[in-house]
Amino acid sequence: MSEFHQDLSEEKSKSQVKRELHALQELGERLAGLRPEQLDRLPLTDALRRALLDAPKHTAHIARKRHIQYIGKLMRDQDIDAILALFEQLDASSRQYNERFHALERWRDRLLDGGDEALEAFVGDYPDTDRQHLRGLIRQARHETAQNKPPAASRKIFKYIRDLDESRRGLR
């Protein structure tokens, strides 16, 4: 009789199976949102790759739902750990991008609020800075703020700082 109970404990309940299949569908929907070059980094079967690339074609609600269910079915044979690892990597790179973006925004605000000390600190971090150009942009941004004009120069400062940062990191 203990063998019978042991067999029952190893079987998954219908609810558990449904939860797992639903999780695969959600993961498949997230995969469908990736760009093709990101999908190329994953070890996917050809059928799943085609289904993921076809997903944007299904725009009607029921058709999309049915297609996502099909993707979930195809995902049963996939290496889920590799897919989850890619999403962790993408999320980490997105976090890094956001952190860098916020750091550049702080530099812009510091340059606008601070004086020459802020400019000197920035030039210390970014030695390739064109001081004269940056001073002109700062002066223009302060003038726009005083005149209650749209912050066009402030945007130019951010773009200039971002370009300097990208060139320093070798992204340009």
From Swiss-Prot:
Q: GO cellular component annotations, sorted alphabetically?
A: cytosol
Extract the CDD domains matched here: YjgA-like
What InterPro entries does the record point to?
DarP, DarP_sf
- A Pfam cross-reference name: DarP
> Which GO terms of type biological process are on file?
assembly of large subunit precursor of preribosome
Q: Where in the cell is it found?
A: Cytoplasm
Q: Print the keywords alphabetically.
A: Cytoplasm, Ribosome biogenesis, RNA-binding, rRNA-binding
> What Gene3D superfamilies does its record include?
PSPTO4464-like domains
Question: Which HAMAP family does its entry note?
Answer: DarP (MF_00765)
What task does this protein carry out?
A: Member of a network of 50S ribosomal subunit biogenesis factors which assembles along the 30S-50S interface, preventing incorrect 23S rRNA structures from forming. Promotes peptidyl transferase center (PTC) maturation.
Q: What is this protein called?
A: Dual-action ribosomal maturation protein DarP
Q: Which species is this record about?
A: Azotobacter vinelandii (strain DJ / ATCC BAA-1303)
State the encoding gene.
darP
